[in-house]
A protein has these predicted regions:
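Short alpha-helix carrying the canonical HExxH Zn2+-binding catalytic motif
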Residues: 102-107, 180-181
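A glycine- and small-aliphatic-rich helix-loop capping segment at beta-alpha/alpha-beta transitions
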Residues: 116-127
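Conserved short loop/turn motifs at secondary-structure junctions
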Residues: 106-107, 124-125, 295
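Short active-site segment of divalent metal-dependent hydrolases/proteases
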Residues: 111-115, 185
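Histidine-centered, transition-metal-coordinating active-site segments
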Residues: 1-80, 85-90, 97-98, 119, ...
């Protein structure tokens, strides 16, 4: 008698094309485990990431704007969920493995710092070997979660997480889908948030973006997703040459007007002061590190453990920690 997992694996032989990764053909995990009777290996990966502490913390990590006032600005968690939905849609249309797309998408930003890319740039300056969030995402799932044991994800999921920014020679087509959908998501929702914040007005959008993608967020997303699906074939996942021009203009516009706008850049010095202060404090007083990071310190060294701890903080917790360390406690005098 077959179990639900085996039935799903048989179904994948029909649903997942020759260029996709079928769960039954996975390279497996770093530590061998007994198969689950209900879920495929990639479904288990997605569940493990969703139930991790690092995933829950994404809800309090900045996407673009530091400490925004309002309930509708994106966070690193909402961004991750948007990427996940887009990746499943594209993966299904291209007859790739939706579950692997989902697992990679859910884990792709687990290593992001507090305060978004401003925090990443700060830690890259502070930590000698340098800091890259995609490498940290892999580190989170490999050796930080579960008290240092990691989530023991499948090799395809691990490579996809590492490859989501720069690519990897062993990456799957599912990993390429997630990388493209990551761009589709942040291009559109960062513009939407910038317009909501009054940083950019609709009339300022480059003409090529309006003509090819429209003015509504949903239409822009649909146009880009449709182009990926229509362009990708025979194992090659990408966008058309003419859409690449729009893509490049879109990126350049956001970098000039949103990511590097004077207000955002003006806050970066504060971010570096906060993270540098916390980082140097724990390097000076390693005995104050949480117990979870003592084992990492013994295994990988003090500075690595402190970097892991600081990079995992949420925006609010980093500000709280800075206050606890450097701001004198208020005393009530009667």
């Amino acid at each position: 008698m077959t179990c639900p997992r085996q039935e799903r694996e048989e179904l994948e032989k029909i649903l997942v094309g020759d260029f996709g990764v079928r769960a039954a053909d996975s390279y497996g995990r770093r530590r061998a485990e007994e198969e689950d009777p209900v879920r495929t290996c990639f479904q288990r990966d997605a569940d493990r990431i969703t139930h991790s502490k690092a995933f829950r913390r994404l809800k309090h990590k900045t996407q673009v704007f530091l400490q925004p006032e309002g309930d509708h600005y994106r966070t690193r968690l909402t961004h991750t969920l948007e990427v996940t939905r887009l990746a499943r849609t594209v993966g299904r249309a291209l007859r790739l493995n939706e579950d692997l797309c989902e697992a990679i998408a859910l884990g792709h930003d687990l290593g992001h710092t507090p305060f978004g890319h401003a925090g990443e740039r700060a830690l890259n300056e502070i930590y000698g070997p340098g800091f890259r969030h995609y490498e940290q995402s892999l580190r989170v799932v490999d050796c930080i979660e579960k008290d240092g044991r990691g989530l023991n994800l499948c090799q395809e999921t691990r490579i996809g997480i590492l490859a989501h920014t720069k690519g990897h020679p062993e990456e799957s087509r599912e990993a390429v889908v997630v990388r493209l959908c990551d761009h589709v998501a942040y291009l559109n929702h960062d513009l939407d948030d910038a317009m909501r914040a009054g940083i950019v007005a609709e009339f300022e959008l480059p003409e090529i973006i309006v003509k090819r993608l429209g003015t509504r967020n949903s239409r822009r997303i649909n146009s880009l997703v449709d182009n990926i699906i229509r362009t990708s074939s025979a194992g090659n996942v990408g966008i058309s040459d003419d859409m690449q021009e729009v893509w490049d203009v879109f990126h350049e516009f956001l970098y000039d007007r949103v990511y590097h706008n004077p207000v955002a850049k003006g806050e970066e010095a504060k971010v570096e002061n906060i993270l540098r202060g916390i980082w140097e404090h724990y390097c000076r007083y390693p005995e104050k590190l949480p117990d979870d990071f003592r084992g990492i310190m013994e295994r990988d060294g003090l500075e690595r453990a402190v970097t892991d701890y600081v990079s995992g903080m949420t925006d609010d917790y980093a500000i709280y920690q800075y206050g606890e360390i450097f701001i004198p406690m208020a005393w009530s005098v009667k």
